[in-house]
Amino acid sequence: MCSMPHRFRRLPLAAAIALTLPLPALADTPKPTELDRVQVKVSTATRSERLLSDVPIRTEVLRKEDIALRAATDFSRAAELINGLRVESNCQNCNTSEVQLLGLPGAYNQLLFDGIPLLSTLGSVYGLEQIPAGFVDRIEVVKGGGSALYGPGAVAGVINLIPPLPARSGGHVQAGMDVLKGTPQKNADVRLDLVAKDADAGLSVIAQRNWNSGIDYNGDGYTEITRKNLKVGGLQAWYAPTPGTRLRLDLQMTDETRRGGNRLDQPEYLANIAESLDTKYRRGSVSWDQEITADVDFRLAYAFADIDRDSFYGGLGDVVTDPSAPGYDPLQLDPDVAGSAASRSWRQYGRTHNPLHYIDSQLNWRRGAHALAFGVQYKHEALRDDNRTGDGQRLAVLEDATFHNLGAFIQDEWSLRDNVDLVLGARVDKSSELDNAVFSPRIALAWQANPNLKWRAGIATGFRAPEIFVEDVHVDTLGGEQVRVRNTDGLKEERALTTLFGFDWRSDPANPVWSWDATASYARIRDTFALGEIQRGDDGQLSQLRYNASGSNVMGAETNLGWQPSPQWRLTAGASWYRSRFREPQRIFDDTGDGGDTVIESRDYLKTPRWTGLAQLSWMPAEPWETFVALRHTGPMSVLNNRLGELHRTRSFLVTDLGARWHRHLGAQAQQEVSVAAGVKNVFDQRQKDLEVGALRDSDYVYGPRFARSWYVNLRYAF
């Protein structure tokens, strides 16, 4: 494998910049203290709105100003702006992705919308790209499982998408384009907010569309970026009949088609490789927040998600499809000819239905130095996955499962002193997949050592039950053949213990020119779920077996540095280091059963770099302008190529983005705004160079930056 140029290898990661601090707002020229992240109000850590500097459990924030400056159109692109939070692509054909947190894969964190779980099992496959930025006011990230308020599997933390709550009627219209390899990726969205005069009720209507043609990076005729057409519509409504009551309704409907591979103008079964998805996703929630007295309040919420998906994973494989090419055989393209390639691919269609229901309740009682929280949560999910023919006939039921989890929690936020907060909590969860309930204690401590320095520590336990996972409903392909995942008999639950210790420092609480924080973490996972090598079964199908490994350990550290000498300049820097390893080597490749002689074992988590970092310098030369230069570093990682039977250590990547934003206020009260954002993403085109090619490619062999160099422009009118 090639390596990063010498000058980049020596670049100190401590100089990489993380966007965990908010950027300057363009509407005004505020004082630096107004921009410091400790002044931001958050609600995720304790489910009560507090200043970020006061919460006892470490929380990081990405505000809408940050998202707008970088022209991020969906959550997957916005998430990459947070230090220690990494989006990894997992398929060259369909571009499914996951969010890694604390050095752990996406299955170990929980994605929330206004505090309520957002994605079902099937929704997690492509859901990161199906959440428009227009639905989000800010993103709050709680790393580690220090709060008992969230589910048992959130051992790496929670990512909470907070929706806007407009104070006046208005809205925006926005359109943009990224030009990548000469192909435009287009997006447009509109938002309309209607707010009552006394602001006790409101309605927001949102719509967004993203669409692009398939993009081929290496000219082999097979896409690296899927052809996609995403349409999203939704509404958010709220009503506060009394000062202590708030009712909220959120609805979202998503219609997405995506297809990757080759021969995109032909039916899927006539492509050498095709991964094609047609997804209908309906999601909603209703919540009731009620203040009973000054010391007692409660919240009740119900959420649902319902997904229907028609899919195709597979293809003809290495079959000649050009009539003028040597070896062309038209019978191979006829599904009615027994034994032909088309007769096999005709049977690779599928249909999946995945409903999810979630009920959440919480009672808060403040008494003296204690803030007690009690709650019950219930999740019910079903998944049916059928294998079908090209004309819709059912061949087999691949999955037909229903599972649920009933959890109860108690948490005491105890102010031991004016400068010491202790959070004691515990959960009891009964999963339908386990015989016994699981007790998960959690504790967090915060100590304000002086006005400039705050220390935090936390210990949490959690588990993951052996349910249906993302890998079961996303099907990898190897040479046009499906690779299915199944659980071994007697698969046990994972048990996890995570610990965190860190500090936050500010140079001057009243005028913070400098800020610095650092956190060390350690996670011990028992009976870790692991995927074995790809094998061909007695039925001739390729599959991977999920089993319990002996366990794994993940240790790491993150640090962020911020400097703002004036409202015009801001520099933020951060780096993360994580070592994610199994306790014993795991066999990840073995072709001896097919007559080969290659066996590969590894202790490392695959596609998990040890070093990552982010960087941004922003400058406001004049009130209408803001410019930035940003860096994103991804260190080497271990990646398996199943086609070659090789474990590769990748190169490092240093992605550079440049951009600017101009705006002008209009109207008598300057409530209207016109803005233009433009720039270049991935200026030096840092990305994977050894992409798999042709019909026999291993779709899972993809790593590093997801997008090649692109030019972008975004136009926005707010009113």
Stretch-by-stretch model annotation:
Residues 120-122, 134-137, 148-219, 226-233, ...:
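Outer-membrane beta-barrel translocator/receptor signature
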Residues 191-192, 297-313, 448, 456, ...:
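Membrane-embedded beta-barrel scaffold of Gram-negative outer-membrane proteins
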Residues 415-419, 515, 521-524, 545-641, ...:
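Gram-negative outer-membrane beta-barrel transporters
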Residues 183-211, 220-258, 276-297, 366-374, ...:
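Transmembrane beta-barrel wall of Gram-negative outer-membrane proteins
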Residues 2, 9, 16, 40, ...:
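Conserved C-terminal beta-signal and adjacent last beta-strands/turns
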Residues 98, 116-143:
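Short acidic/polar hinge/loop motifs at secondary-structure boundaries
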Residues 212-215, 220, 224-230, 244-291, ...:
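Flexible loop and strand-edge segments within Gram-negative outer membrane beta-barrel domains
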Residues 51, 76, 80-117, 137:
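Extracytoplasmic beta-strand/coil segments of soluble accessory domains associated
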